[in-house]
């Protein structure tokens, strides 16, 4: 008898291929996490085509409590939030594991591009073998969940996944990827904040000496290091150097002050022992840099071998030993 497994099935090509691959070795139960938008019918059709029991779980209240409220608060605090890195350990995976425990399933799987590998008898989160690696967004997961996790796409790239979907005759083979924040259709987070009554008021752009350079449209519209869309004419290009929440000011500079080799982070989550120098990634899209971690009771001071441009408060710092994620911590600001 095959072991039971719960799969997060979104209705996209990644989780669809994950379902088809897992069917060979597991009794797969498919779960669609409902946030009140589209996708459920595609997920249902996929589950039915694979004869996989299908469940819809409404996660809107949990998403609001753990993700949306914090997302809005971070922007009003001058930070740039990373909602997926928050949702995975607080909403998505807890919901899937709760369903797994309810039906007696030993394992949980998703279509993320990541791997679970064994190191010294420990299940570890590791990077996928493709450029679409999503281990950064999973770096806040509790270590105790890792032995029960499966990521069947971890050794595939996106084109291989689409090709498998075509070979399998899956109707979502050429379905476009979702590039937006799932709870903000159109990715217009400023409009979403305004609808919630959370938009920050207009204020001044200033230089480091306090000289007014122009007017900004609300601090929530800007992120550290931003150089586009400022609407300020000047003798040279300007970048967001700092967001002063108390004064409702956005400080601009020529960008020379944005690079640093010392980054303070807080609220650490450890997945594997740190045995020496690591590499660190400070944003999902950024490349890694060599670093040394100085760990204390409140967080981590990260010393990088080369300067890092604009490590942004609200973003995650993920730490790697080779391909293995050893931990993560939030960039302080």
Tell where the protein language model's regions lie, with residue ranges:
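ATP-dependent adenylation/nucleotidyltransferase module used to activate substrates
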Residues: 1-139, 150, 159-160, 240
């Amino acid at each position: 008898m095959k072991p039971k497994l719960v799969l997060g099935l979104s209705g996209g090509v990644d989780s669809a291929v994950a379902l088809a691959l897992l069917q060979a070795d597991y009794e797969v139960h498919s779960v669609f996490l409902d946030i009140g938008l589209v996708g459920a019918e595609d997920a249902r059709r996929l589950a039915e085509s694979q004869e996989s029991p299908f469940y819809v779980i409404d996660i809107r209240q949990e998403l609001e409590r753990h993700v949306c409220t914090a997302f809005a608060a971070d922007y009003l605090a001058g930070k740039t939030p990373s909602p997926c890195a928050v949702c995975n350990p607080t909403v998505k995976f807890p919901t899937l594991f709760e369903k797994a425990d309810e039906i007696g399933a030993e394992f949980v799987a998703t279509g993320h591009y990541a791997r679970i590998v064994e190191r010294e008898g420990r299940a570890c989160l590791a990077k996928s073998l493709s450029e679409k690696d999503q281990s950064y967004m999973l770096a806040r997961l509790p270590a105790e969940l890792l032995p029960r996790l499966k990521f069947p796409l971890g050794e595939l790239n996106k084109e291989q996944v689409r090709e498998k979907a075509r070979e399998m005759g899956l109707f979502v083979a050429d379905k476009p990827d979702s590039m937006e924040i799932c709870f903000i259709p159109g990715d217009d987070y400023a409009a979403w904040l305004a609808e919630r009554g959370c938009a920050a008021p207009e204020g001044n752009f200033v230089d480091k000496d306090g000289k007014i350079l122009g007017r900004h449209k609300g601090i929530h519209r800007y992120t550290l290091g931003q150089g586009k869309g400022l609407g300020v004419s000047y003798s040279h290009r300007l970048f967001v150097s700092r967001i002063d929440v108390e004064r409702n000011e956005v400080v601009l500079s020529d960008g020379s002050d944005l690079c640093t080799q010392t980054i303070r982070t807080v609220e650490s989550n450890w997945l594997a022992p740190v045995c020496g120098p690591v590499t660190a990634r400070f944003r999902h899209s950024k490349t890694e840099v060599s670093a040394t971690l100085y760990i204390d009771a409140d967080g981590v001071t990260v010393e990088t071998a080369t300067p890092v441009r604009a490590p942004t408060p609200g973003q995650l710092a993920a730490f790697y030993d080779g391909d293995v994620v050893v931990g993560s911590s939030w960039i302080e600001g």
